[in-house]
Amino acid sequence: MSTGLDMSLDDMIAKNRKSRGGAGPARGTGSGSGPGPTRRNNPNRKSTRSAPYQSAKAPESTWGHDMFSDRSEDHRSGRSSAGIETGTKLYISNLDYGVMNEDIKELFAEVGELKRYTVHFDRSGRSKGTAEVVYSRRGDALAAVKKYNDVQLDGKPMKIEIVGTNLQTAAAPSGRPANGNSNGAPWRGGQGRGGQQRGGGRGGGGRGGGGRGRRPGKGPAEKISAEDLDADLDKYHSGDMETN
């Protein structure tokens, strides 16, 4: 019997196959005691499991700050910003607890158009004895104050106030007339800060007063001759020429 050293490589391979009982199953076939379940990976199969959330998609356009653009658009279109109420509001107090919203509406709608009206209630639903109405026009609000203030409603006089700064108070009359002074004489245009009229008459003290005469001294006024006036006039002109 030939030993393994004398055998060729092909003979050794054939011998090993015979000793194992023939050619075994090919690798990967997995033939065992029974065909087990095989999982098929179908690429077209869709998972029925729903995701807990959906991923946000990026916006197609570039984001831009639009806060100021919205405000400018509202300003151009005349729309008021949120939270800012237009109109004139009246605050009504000293109301009977039985006065309801419909009573306020019926009473104050007789004067003008109402934008809003409400009676104030506490948490238990009991009236606080106060209410407020908002008129579209300020003139209607003023008319309502004149008509209903201190007027009794269900036996109690209403106290009505205008809320906010929409009402322009009339200016207090001044002691000085608009077209004159306190004595009734009309004011002249171009008065100085000291209350004197600009450009006093001739002979008024000094150059500042517009006159050409000498300033009055403490003693009695001396008489000025024509020669003195001419001399002073020459000095005046010569002084102006030196200055220029």
Swiss-Prot record:
All copies of domain RRM, residue ranges: 88-165
Listed Gly residues bias regions: 21-35, 187-211
Single biological process term from Gene Ontology: mRNA transport
One Pfam family named in its UniProt record: RRM_1
UniProt entry tagged with the keyword S-adenosyl-L-methionine: no
Record GO cellular component, one term: nucleoplasm
Subcellular location: Nucleus, Nucleoplasm; Nucleus, Nucleolus
Residues carrying N-acetylserine: 2
SMART domains (alphabetical): FoP_duplication, RRM
Residue span of region Disordered: 1-82, 169-244
Basic and acidic residues compositional bias, start-end: 67-77, 220-244
Organism domain of life: Eukaryota
Annotated Gene3D superfamilies: 3.30.70.330
Keyword Ligase part of the UniProt annotation: no
Broad class of where this protein is predominantly found: nucleus
Keyword terms, alphabetized: Acetylation, mRNA transport, Nucleus, RNA-binding, Transport
UniProt GO molecular function: RNA binding
SUPFAM superfamilies: RNA-binding domain, RBD (SSF54928)
UniProt-listed PANTHER family: RNA AND EXPORT FACTOR BINDING PROTEIN (PTHR19965), THO COMPLEX SUBUNIT 4A (PTHR19965:SF72)
Family recorded in the similarity comment: Belongs to the ALYREF family.
Task performed by this protein: Export adapter involved in nuclear export of spliced and unspliced mRNA.
Name by which UniProt lists this protein: THO complex subunit 4A
Organism: Arabidopsis thaliana
